[in-house]
Amino acid sequence: YYCADFLIGTHVQPCAPDLILFYHLAGKGIRARGKQVFLQHGIIKDEMEWLHRKNMYMDLFVCGAKPEYEYIRDTFGYPEHVPQYVGLARFDNLIRAERKEKMILVMPTWRGSHYPTGEAFRKTAYYEHFQSLLCCKELEQLLEQQDYRLVFYPHIEMQKDSRRFKSGSDRITIVSKETHDVQKLLMDCALLVTDYSSVFFDVAFLRKPVVYYQFDEEEF
């Protein structure tokens, strides 16, 4: 890691053996000598001060949308050559997407590395609200009436607790990265339900409707 000429990845501290550890080491000036290329894995939609130049070092900061590029260029404090508007490869297939099934895709976002896991996860508002949705009788009836199905795909970092969710209907399935390709789900769905995930940009790009289910907006 420390000997590489280039470190290229979709997360900060790309290729680090331990992302959190090496992030803190970099903050103390202990950085790999290779050029840092941040590809990103979505469009930035929030204030992310920890990505500003005063807190993070990058040699190339890839931007996926022009307004995002202008925002990063004007507010993040990097030299002008660092942020570059070149687009994200994840959008390339979306241009050719023509499929649309009678499927509702539910994709809530990550809740942070300190969010409860294991049995404690069952006591969180996240679990309670989405489990309630998955077992909602009115929703089951609506899916049956309209001949739709619902697919629940939690953020990849939350999927370690996916097995704790239960479906109340054969029209509602709980899936993961092991069984489904997330981009195919985005291309196939007729509608997206999310809380705060920037994946809504992908669905908006496809000109499909988005419903926001933000039960903890004041806390998140």
Model segments located where?
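Structural motif
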Residues: 6, 35, 60, 103, ...
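Nucleotide-activated donor-binding/catalytic signature segment of Leloir-type glycosyltransferases, i.e.
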Residues: 160-177
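Active-site and donor-binding regions of nucleotide-sugar-utilizing enzymes
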Residues: 1-94
